[in-house]
UniProtKB/Swiss-Prot annotation:
GO biological process: translation
Native species: Bdellovibrio bacteriovorus (strain ATCC 15356 / DSM 50701 / NCIMB 9529 / HD100)
Gene Ontology cellular component list: cytoplasm; ribonucleoprotein complex; ribosome
Job description of the protein: Binds together with bS18 to 16S ribosomal RNA.
Domain of life: Bacteria
TM spans (from-to): none
One term of GO molecular function: structural constituent of ribosome
Keywords for this protein: Ribonucleoprotein, Ribosomal protein, RNA-binding, rRNA-binding
The name this protein goes by in its record: Small ribosomal subunit protein bS6
Short name of any one Pfam family annotated for the protein: Ribosomal_S6
Family: Belongs to the bacterial ribosomal protein bS6 family.
UniProt-listed InterPro entries: Ribosomal_bS6, Ribosomal_bS6_sf, Ribosomal_S6_plastid/chlpt, Transl_elong_EF1B/ribsomal_bS6
SUPFAM superfamilies to which the protein is assigned, alphabetical: Ribosomal protein S6
Disulfide bonding pattern of the chain: none
Amino acid sequence: METTTTKKPYEVVVLMHPDASLEEQKDLFKKNKATIESYKGSINSLETWGKRTLATPIGKLKKAIYFHSTFEADTQAIAELERTMRINDKVLRFMHTRLDERTSLGKFMEGFKKGLAESAAREKEREAKAAARKAAFAAAKAERSERYDKGE
């Protein structure tokens, strides 16, 4: 009896060490692409989110390089991808998730990118507020120093 393998949609988020070189990043995803294609799968998208702050530190690391990818493959490809990522020292964390087959991948990515843009906007807003607080603190410190120098 012949078994047929059906490709299912997946997404993966990979967190790499913040000191990973561009070559190491490219090598990882070349290997992943080769693995997926060897199991007759296909990659739909690969996005680099860049270096971001972790929600909780991993060891002593507070930042990681984030990657997001969507692809179609069978379950054997997932097992092989996970095996190769566990071996790689530069991969801190990864998570494969099977996507709902009832939702088209295009529709999923549309909603995902909208959420990602909102998250980036919130992060920029937080950074701007932190910079404003830092500037206000520096100005207050300079004013106190000035008054102290005058002997007030």
